Amino acid sequence: MTQDSQIDSLLPPLRLNRRGFIATAVATGFTAATGHAAAPTAIRTPADGLDAGEVRIPAEGGEMPAYRAAPQGKTGLPTVLVINEIFGVHEYIQDLCRRLAREGYLAVAPEVFARQGDPARYTDIATLRAEVVDKAPDAQVLGDLDAAAKWAAGNGGAAGRLAATGFCWGGRIAWLYAAHNPELKAAAAWYGQLRGKPDALRPVYPIDLVNDLRAPVLGLYGSADAGIPVADVEAMRKAQAQGSSAARASAIEIYQDAPHGFHADYRPSYREEAARDGWRRMLAWFADRGV
């Protein structure tokens, strides 16, 4: 199984760079390469009433940029770490942070590819993957999420109320993080890869970790996903039933006829009904677990 078919539906038409301006080069390059145009369904969540923007987070090797959004002037907030697709913390990911902030969360999306490069500079998928995404070790990414969680706890987040959600590439990481951080209370993985060929940088996949899960995960998948067969999802369900207590408490929802990237409202892959239902389920999943 390759990730190319998964990624095709997620190509972003535009991105806000780290200073908040529109980076049109990536949009032009990706659109030219794929023939896709921006979907009119793209959601734009306003930042009024929120503290939203770039922050710098102490991490291994220096500072890591991140986007954060929270209700303005509030503290003691439940925290959600938002884990990006291969395109970094572009406008869609930032908008998800603002949506979560409007639900009362401190949402933090760390730039976990900052050491490898800026995804906004790339105009073709193969080069982006080879030079940035595939060079980011799981261990580094999980450490960066730990750094983001620590930063959040000292900047308005409530201790003991931590969740994570990830999309596509980040969906796989969300599963891994649920096995990594004992302080995580819940996670939601949107169409994250469940099986794959291990290598030095990616030694395990979610299906390998069912005995190690420390937090229950809500998996959100589509039956028409070209890169993640329903057979893989069903295999994960079966493995969970024999895994740790957190694995047995996890759940997977499969949306009929939904493709990969069905939550990506800026792409033709967007399926509003499935996206809205998945978001509702995610919020309830977090709330039911004290986040």
Label the model's feature ranges.
Residues 40-72:
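N-terminal cap/lid segment of alpha/beta-hydrolase-fold proteins
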Residues 246-291:
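C-terminal catalytic histidine-bearing segment of alpha/beta-hydrolase fold enzymes
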Residues 1-16:
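N-terminal secretory signal peptides
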Residues 123-165:
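Gly/Ser-rich "nucleophile elbow"/oxyanion-hole loop immediately N-terminal to the catalytic nucleophile
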Residues 77-85:
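Short beta-strand element of the alpha/beta-hydrolase
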Residues 16-31:
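N-terminal export leaders
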Residues 213, 219-221:
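Short beta-strand/loop motif that positions the catalytic acidic residue
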Residues 147-209:
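Primarily recognizes the serine-hydrolase "nucleophile elbow" in alpha/beta-hydrolase
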